């Protein structure tokens, strides 16, 4: 089935999460459940969880097999960066980069707890050094540079470490002429770092300009629930192709902030992926189960027609 036919089916069912996706997702779920009968789970964190959309109780073992998609309503629950790397990258090909980079508390920021203690807490909780993992790996045998933000680490907030790791990833992709994918999941800039976090927006954006315009290389932004604030206002919306997951919350400011500023009521659902897609702000909405295949097809098309400038290295 072509992508155009796929979208026509969604519109015919009155939305991108219609009966077609539900059936396809359930079929995928049954296949994965049979294949991964013995998947391991951490029983100390509980055996059951609840869907954020339909509130149906979900068995954690099946949920992991389902790529964290609710088998009742098709809602896409949040994934960790580790799970997303496993979803997108061919097994055994992932090479992480800059794992030892950690944030410094230069402002000595403190509210209910110090910033330093908060970082340590989330490092122990997630096993990550900060809110993003970067590296290179093969996606359907295509070598790509990949950055995956993790909302479980301080709400995926963008601080100096996140900005620097993305910057270095783009530099590496620039030098090696690799396509770039960034999976966004963030509450925005990290307030505990002040202007150091805000400047990451300009730093990443300016480097992407060289990457996309000067070197004619290919950047795909994948927006997941939630993508907000400074990430939306910078690299999140600069992809040559912008893909979102179904029903992903994508915004700059929250609904209440907008309503209080404009002093008028904002309609429900205007900041979800489907609304942005119909307004022309997104290129594709792709269910998680199909994402790797769709990206593989895009990279095949890209490899047939890519234009690369020679002798124009910035670094």
Curated annotation (Swiss-Prot):
Disulfide bonds: none annotated. Coiled coil: none annotated. It holds the Pfam family Carboxyl_trans. Its cofactor is Zn(2+). Keywords: ATP-binding, Chloroplast, Fatty acid biosynthesis, Fatty acid metabolism, Lipid biosynthesis, Lipid metabolism, Metal-binding, Nucleotide-binding, Plastid, Transferase, Zinc, Zinc-finger. Residues 47-315 form the CoA carboxyltransferase N-terminal domain. Transmembrane segments: none annotated. Zn(2+) binds at residues 51, 54, 70, 73. This is Acetyl-coenzyme A carboxylase carboxyl transferase subunit beta, chloroplastic. It comes from Physcomitrium patens.
